[in-house]
Amino acid sequence: LVTVATPNSTHYEISKAFLEAGINVLCEKPMTVTEAEAEDLVLTARRTGTICAVNYGYTGYALVRHMRAMVARGDIGKVRLVVAEFAHGHHANAADADNPRVRWRYDPAQAGVSAQFADCGIHALHMASFVSGQNARELSADFISAIESRKLEDDAMVNVRMDGGTTVRLWTS
């Protein structure tokens, strides 16, 4: 097993090479920066008999698994709305622009089309999907950046309609 925890734009090439070599891959999110690359990794894993997984650690927590079981049993009724927030002060300072460990996260060529949502907000959306047993069907998003020089968002508000009818309202910053 190899873990890929590098800038997002490198995930596809690195993961593909290991899968082709018959080695299972645990990839940091996002799996890739394009849908076509992600689909290719799925097909490569199937063809080579390997596993290509994305690291969403929160769904391993006992409390999250307990919530999922409660929802599946109907203990709390139909889930109509999930409100999730994933807030932190990480990268809140404009001085972070000089930090090479931070800089790539706001560079579309390395991070892809999203920064904050792809890095943190996706955890909340994944938990909502995991707990509700529903998948995202459609979404609308408002991405802004408090630090104007950034090319990608450091604040995101996302509304998601799940395939079972649940609405997810998510904020991350």
Roles of regions detected by a PLM:
Residues 1, 7-8, 12-59, 74:
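Beta-strand-loop-alpha-helix segment that lines the small-molecule cofactor/substrate pocket
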Residues 6-7, 172:
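Short glycine-/small-residue-rich Rossmann-like dinucleotide-binding loops
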Residues 23, 50-51, 80, 164-166:
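Short, well-ordered coil/turn segments that N-cap beta-strands
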Residues 26, 51-53, 83, 140, ...:
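Structural detector of well-ordered beta-strand residues that form the stable sheet scaffold
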Residues 58-142, 146-150:
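Predominantly a Rossmann-like dinucleotide-binding segment in NAD(P)-dependent oxidoreductases
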Residues 81, 157-159, 169:
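Conserved hydrophobic/aromatic beta-strand scaffold that supports enzyme active sites
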Residues 146-153, 163-173:
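NAD(P)-dinucleotide binding in Rossmann-like oxidoreductases
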